[in-house]
């Protein structure tokens, strides 16, 4: 059995405690309540952009819900996930902010555009051969790989601003993505 110094034992204890804390957070009601409208309504307080809550999760189990710092004096960004990137049943990651917090992914090309709440949503899918950029992709690559959808949805009231929405997906069809994005409703 190896002998550890006092510092090493303390470091190992802290790592173990951090792991237990992370596991507790992952199974907490906050993490598992992503489709609960009350979570979205509560998140709206203090934000200047309109928070949109999904009315469907395309039968994917909710997996997380959080507000994170967007930096640069911007409002916090809302992030909610459904399903798992590691499963074959699909994954959706919803990001809402006043403007994009991060650049979108590389290696995606246009699949289609559609209208939602008067705005144009753009669905992009994985590029053939996993190249860093392409002008077009197709629904089959979207379904087998990853997707990235963006739309700026209108303000829910005159007191709020419009919302930049990014939807990252894995293993989802164009129909699924359209259903999810079209089902986003402003909280009251």
Region annotations inferred by a language model:
Residues 1-6, 11, 20-43:
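C-terminal region of N-terminal signal peptides and the immediate post-cleavage residues
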Residues 13-28, 146-154:
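Hydrophobic alpha-helical membrane segments, chiefly transmembrane helices and signal peptide h-regions
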Residues 31, 80, 165:
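A broad, low-specificity signal marking well-ordered, structured residues that form hydrophobic/aromatic
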Residues 35-161:
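Short, solvent-exposed recognition patches
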Residues 161-188:
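Surface-exposed amphipathic alpha-helical segments
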């Amino acid at each position: 059995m190896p002998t550890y110094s006092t510092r090493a034992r303390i470091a190992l204890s802290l790592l173990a405690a951090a792991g237990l804390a992370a596991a507790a957070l992952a199974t907490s009601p906050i993490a598992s309540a992503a489709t609960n409208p009350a979570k979205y309504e509560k998140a709206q307080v203090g934000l200047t952009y309109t928070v949109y809550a999904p009315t469907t999760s395309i039968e994917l189990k909710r997996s997380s819900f959080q507000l994170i710092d967007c930096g640069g004096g911007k409002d916090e960004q809302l992030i909610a996930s459904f399903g798992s990137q590691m499963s074959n049943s699909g994954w959706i990651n919803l990001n809402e902010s006043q403007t994009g917090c991060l650049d979108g992914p590389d290696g995606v090309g246009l699949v289609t555009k559609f209208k939602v709440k008067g705005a144009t949503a753009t669905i992009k899918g994985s590029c053939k051969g996993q190249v860093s950029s392409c002008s077009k992709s197709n629904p089959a690559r979207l379904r087998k790989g990853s997707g990235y959808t963006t739309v700026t949805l209108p303000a829910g009231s005159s007191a709020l601003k419009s919302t930049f929405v990014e939807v990252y997906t894995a293993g989802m069809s164009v129909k699924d993505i359209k259903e999810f994005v079209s089902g986003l409703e402003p909280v009251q």
